[in-house]
Amino acid sequence: MPKRTKSVTAKAGAGAANSNQPFAISRENAEHYRWGVDCDGWHLVRDKNLSVIEEFMPPGAAEIRHYHEHAQQFFYILSGEVLVEANGENTLVPAGSGIRILPGTPHQIRNPTSSAVHFLVISQPPSHGDRIDVPPA
């Protein structure tokens, strides 16, 4: 007997982070926030153990150099490319690639290009509230 397929969609503002039921999540129904100068983030998953955020970074934008005491992060580039400085080393990360940042590692992500960048930030545990700003390298 074939298995039934059900649609798993959510209405805007459905609170994906707090739901125990599976459903499709996107920017359209995720919690949105602004950061930096003209940068956007959407919480696709947000719970006490894991954070998955889709972020948009316009040309020339950069975050403040910082580190996280507890959170490890993985940045996966969906489109465009970013320059990631970690521990004083610069790494160009193009679309289809990612970079892992371990807890305690000073880092900064920048978009030095003339095109916008979309990327995922996966943090475990979540990095919000676990950020310590540091001077530029």
Residue ranges and their predicted role:
Residues 48-50, 58-61, 81, 125-128:
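Short, charged/polar surface micro-motifs in flexible loops or helix N-caps
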Residues 38, 53-68:
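Conserved short histidine dyad/triad with adjacent acidic residue
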Residues 70-72, 76-82, 87:
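Glycine- and acidic-residue-biased ligand/ion/polar-headgroup-sensing regions
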Residues 1-50, 64, 130-137:
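A short, N-terminal "cap"/entry segment at the start of jelly-roll beta-barrel domains
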Residues 88-103:
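Short acidic-glycine-tyrosine-enriched beta hairpin
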Residues 81-83, 90, 106, 116:
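Structural motif
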Residues 48-50, 70, 114-115:
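Short strand-connecting beta-turns/loops that link adjacent beta-strands
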Residues 103-129:
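Ligand-binding loop in jelly-roll beta-barrel domains
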